[in-house]
Amino acid sequence: SPRLQYALDQYVLRGGRLVVLLDPNARADMISPENQFGQQPQLASDLPELLNSWGVDYDSTKVVGDRLHATQVNTGQGVMSFPMWMTFRTQSLDQEHPITAQLENLLFVEAGSFKKAAESKTDFTALISLSEQSGLIDAFQLRFSPPDQLSREMKVDDSAKAVMAITAGNFSSAFPNGQPAKEKKETQAKAAADESEAETPLMHTHLNESTERNSILLFSDVDFLSDQF
C-alpha cells in the first residue's frame, strides 16, 4: 500500500537498513495457505515509487531467463535446460563483495531483473549479473506455456541485467508531499469500524532527503529462500 511504502521510504531516509525481495512470478505464493480456497494468487510484487526514487529500473510484468545459467529441469516429457530457472555458481558471483564472496550455488526461479535507471545519481552495484545470453518474457506466459515453448520465445538481448544488486547514495523521498492519505475501504463494514479510530500520528517529521548516505540490498526473486527449491 502507499502508506506502507511511505513508511519504508522514511525509514531509509533516516538511515535504516533495508533488504528488498521482489518477484514477478513467486511460485512460493502459489502454495500459500491463503490460496487454498481457490483464490487467484497474486504472484507479482513491486515497489514502483520507491524503486524510482532509489534509481532502479524493475518491471514486475517481465521474467528474465539466461541460457548460460539455465538449469536442468524435468518437464514430464524429458529433461531440458530451462533458462528461466537460473543456477549461479561461484564464478558468476561477485567475489570481491562480502555479501556474495562466500556463496557457492544459488537457484533463482523465474526471477525479475534490475538495472540502473537512466537518470539515476545513485551508485548501482550488480552482485549477480546476467550474461549476454539473457532475455525477457512476459510473466503471464508462465501460467499457460510449457517450458520448451517459453525457452524458444525468449528473445535474447545484451542489455545489462542483475538479479541481486545494491543501490547506494543520498536518496530523495518518493513522497515529496508527505504521508499519503488512507485508501478507501473496500466494504462499508470496514469503513464503519474505522470511524472510531483516530488517525495515527507520525512519530517523526517528514524528510524529503536522506540524513546520510545509505544502501539497499535488492533481490528480484523470493523463491530461492523456499525449501521447495
Spans of model-derived segments:
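Acidic, S/T/G-rich, low-cysteine, solvent-exposed domains in lumenal/extracellular/periplasmic regions
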Residues: 1-229
